[in-house]
Curated annotation (Swiss-Prot):
Residues 537-703 are annotated as: Nonhelical region (NC1). Induction: Some up-regulation in diabetic nephropathy. Residues 1-28 form the signal peptide. It is found in: Secreted, Extracellular space, Extracellular matrix, Basement membrane. Residues 79-97, 506-532 have a biased composition (Pro residues). The keyword Signal applies. It comes from Homo sapiens (Human). SMART domains: C1Q. This is Collagen alpha-2(VIII) chain. It comes from the Eukaryota.
Amino acid sequence: MLGTLTPLSSLLLLLLVLVLGCGPRASSGGGAGGAAGYAPVKYIQPMQKGPVGPPFREGKGQYLEMPLPLLPMDLKGEPGPPGKPGPRGPPGPPGFPGKPGMGKPGLHGQPGPAGPPGFSRMGKAGPPGLPGKVGPPGQPGLRGEPGIRGDQGLRGPPGPPGLPGPSGITIPGKPGAQGVPGPPGFQGEPGPQGEPGPPGDRGLKGDNGVGQPGLPGAPGQGGAPGPPGLPGPAGLGKPGLDGLPGAPGDKGESGPPGVPGPRGEPGAVGPKGPPGVDGVGVPGAAGLPGPQGPSGAKGEPGTRGPPGLIGPTGYGMPGLPGPKGDRGPAGVPGLLGDRGEPGEDGEPGEQGPQGLGGPPGLPGSAGLPGRRGPPGPKGEAGPGGPPGVPGIRGDQGPSGLAGKPGVPGERGLPGAHGPPGPTGPKGEPGFTGRPGGPGVAGALGQKGDLGLPGQPGLRGPSGIPGLQGPAGPIGPQGLPGLKGEPGLPGPPGEGRAGEPGTAGPTGPPGVPGSPGITGPPGPPGPPGPPGAPGAFDETGIAGLHLPNGGVEGAVLGKGGKPQFGLGELSAHATPAFTAVLTSPFPASGMPVKFDRTLYNGHSGYNPATGIFTCPVGGVYYFAYHVHVKGTNVWVALYKNNVPATYTYDEYKKGYLDQASGGAVLQLRPNDQVWVQMPSDQANGLYSTEYIHSSFSGFLLCPT
C-alpha cells in the first residue's frame, strides 16, 4: 500500500510544481487564457506605437532548483530565499492587455535594439509632438505688398498728460473778436489796504450812461460833498478794459466839506455817444467755464480710402500688459517653410471658432534616449489598453529629434476637456491674418507709467490769445546770474547848447590849457582867487567815475575812432541813479518803489516813493529791467503822470521771463519820472534778494 502511494504522491507534487511554474507565466505573458475574462477596451485617443523595449521578466518563468522532499499534502513549508535572476529570454509577441495590476511600477528598462526598417506608408495624424529647438534664422523673404487699409477703429481712452514741450516762438497774435460777456463772478475777498495816493481833483458826478465811455471832460469846480447814499444793486455788466490814463488836470483849491445832500433819482438814459478811439486794452479776467456740451453722435463710416504711405517708425511708449488669453486649440503642424523677414503688423483678424480639446493621453515613463536608428514604418494604432496605476513621475528626458511632418488628418470627434498643459516655448511668428472687424470696446485700463519724453513736434500755428489764468505759486529763489559783459561805448549825442546852470561846488583843478598868444605885458595886479576849471572838451564821452572826480571815458580822435583816456567831466555835475527792487509783486496803480539804490547822484531818486525828481534840466536816458513770473506784466514809464512808453510781456507757465524798456526824455527842473504798472490784471513783476528788477537814469547833456 505504501509502495503504491509513493509514485502517486510524486506525480501529484510534480503536477503542483508545473501548475505553480506555468500559472504566473501565463498571467504575466497575457495569454489567451488570461485574457478570456476581459474584453479589449477601446479609447478615442489613438496611441502612438513606441520603440519595442525588453520585457520585464526577470525572475519569472524559470524553474527553481530546490530539493523537493516528500511531504504530506497538507504541510506548508516556509518561503525560500529569492533566487538569482535568470538569463534574458527572447522577446515574445505582444499579448492582449491584461487585467490592471496593483503593484508598484518597475525600474526603467534598457532600450532595445533598433528594429529593421519597415515599409513607408501614409499614417494617421498623431498627437502634437514636443516643440523642437529654434532653428537658425532663414533667408529674408520677399517684401509683401501693403494690405488694404482697415476701417478706422474706435477712439481710444485719453493718454496721460505729456511733459511740457519747449517754449515756442512768441509772435503777437491778431486781436480776437469781442467775446460773449460771461456770467458775473463771485465777489472776491477784500484786498490789503494800499498806500494813500496823491490827492486828485474832485470832478462833478456824471449821469449813468449805457454807451461806450466818451472822452474825458474838463475838470469842474469842487462841489460840496453829498451824503453817502444807499448801496445800489449789484451790476450785471462785465468789467471794462482799463483805459489810458488821462492828462493831469490843474490843481484846484480844496473846498470846505459840505452838508450831505439827498440822493437824486437816476437821470434819463442819454443818447449813445460816438465810438471812442481804439485803446490799448489788457486781457480781462478769466470767465467761468461753461457747461460741458453733449457728446455728438457717431458719424457714418466713410468710404475706404486708398492705402496710405508707410509712415516713419513711431516712438510710442509700451502699453500695459493685457490679461492672459485662453489657451487656443492645438493646430495641425504644418510644413516648415523658409523663415522670412517679419512682415508688417496686419489688422486684427476675425476670431475663429474655438476648437475642442483632445482627450488626455496616458502618462508614459520616459526612457533613456537610445541611439538614433533608421526610421521604421509607422504601424497602425493599436487598441487602447485599460488605464494603469499612475506611476511615480520620472525626470524629464532630453528633447527628442523632430519628426517628419505628417499629412493633416480629418477632424476627429470632440474629446473631453483635458487638464491644462505646461506653457510651451514661444513659437515662430505666424502669417499676417485677414483684417478683422472692430471688437467690442473694452473697459478702461489702469493708468500706465509715465513714458519717456517724445521728440518735440513741429511748431503749430499760433493760437488765439487765451484767457488770463490764475497766478501760480512763487517759485524757489534762483541763483544770481553771472555778470554781463560791459557794453560798447555809444556814439556821441547831438544836443543843443543848454542854458547855464547854477554854479556847483568847486571842482578839482583842471588840466592846464594850451598856452595862448603872448600879449603885451600888463601892469602887475593884486593876487587873484584860484583859477577856474579847465576848458570842457565837447568830444568827450561820459564813462566811469574816478575817485578824484574825473571821468574815465573815450575821446574821439583822428578818423572818428574813440581813444580811451581821462575826460574832464566832473561827476558832481552829472545826476544819475540806479535802484533795484528786492521784494516780489509790488502794488499796481502806483509808482514801483525800487527800494535799494546802487548809486544816487544829486539824490534825485527817492527810494521811499520810487519817483525821480529832476535836479538839473536836460536830456536824460531812463531804462528799466523787470522779471516776470506768475502772470503777465504791463509796465509803463511815466513822466509827470503821463505814460511815455509801455512794455508788455506774456508770461509762459514754468518759465521766468524778462522784459525791459527805455526812453530818452527832456526834463525840466522838478519834473518827475517813475515806473508803474497801470493794471492790476497784468502785475506779475517779480524780484527777490538775488533776482533784481532795476530802474536807472542819467543825464546825457544839460539844457
